């Protein structure tokens, strides 16, 4: 059985008891170096993923030697939103061989930090989804509230400006949520287009200003 384990936004305090239990009982634990460091795992049980993540996961699910083992694959945030569930299904894993363990998403943390009800917001990920930039553009043009995970925040901001959004439009930028270097700032698109930001970023547009 393959368990896709949501590990939350990064701080160990946001791990669920279920996630900890699954990892403790797993025969193999697979994840990025940063994800693996959240747990106390014997070295012989670890598999560290690299930038060739898709190729490595393909090899893993095709490996006959793991068929009867408990495999925990660590997914940042929640595996069902911009996480590894979709990736695994795309590369050939079968739903009946998978159990998804929910985790706390950075979207939820961002909403808590800004004290907003995320049920009132559209939620979009731009991670590897060029077409979603257009969706984001239309939402902002229509003054809709939106929480989004940027792909390249600087370039995303330039895209919005180049397609008619006022450069002074304000966006909340929440970087490295739950880490010691967490930073939350309200910036204009113009400032964002000229800035540098962490790749661990959530953005929030509150939808209540003139474009």
Swiss-Prot record:
Keyword Lipoprotein included in the entry's annotation = no
Specify the superkingdom.
Answer: Archaea
Report keywords, A-Z.
Cobalamin biosynthesis, Methyltransferase, S-adenosyl-L-methionine, Transferase
Source organism per UniProt: Methanocaldococcus jannaschii (strain ATCC 43067 / DSM 2661 / JAL-1 / JCM 10045 / NBRC 100440)
| E.C. numbers | 2.1.1.289
Q: For this chain's UniProt record, which GO biological process terms are given? A: cobalamin biosynthetic process; methylation
Annotated GO molecular function terms are: cobalt-precorrin-7 C15-methyltransferase activity; protein methyltransferase activity
Q: Which family does it belong to?
A: Belongs to the precorrin methyltransferase family.
Q: What class of enzyme is it?
A: transferase
Q: Name one Pfam family in it.
A: TP_methylase
**Catalytic reaction(s) noted:** Co-precorrin-7 + S-adenosyl-L-methionine = Co-precorrin-8X + S-adenosyl-L-homocysteine + H(+)
Write the protein's name. Answer: Probable cobalt-precorrin-7 C(5)-methyltransferase
Q: Does the keyword Methyltransferase apply?
A: yes
The gene for this chain is cbiE
- Cited InterPro entries: 4pyrrol_Mease, 4pyrrol_Methylase_sf, 4pyrrole_Mease_sub1, 4pyrrole_Mease_sub2, CbiE, Cobalamin_biosynth_MTase
The pathway to which it is assigned is: Cofactor biosynthesis; adenosylcobalamin biosynthesis; cob(II)yrinate a,c-diamide from sirohydrochlorin (anaerobic route): step 8/10
> What CDD domains is this protein classified in?
Precorrin-6Y-MT
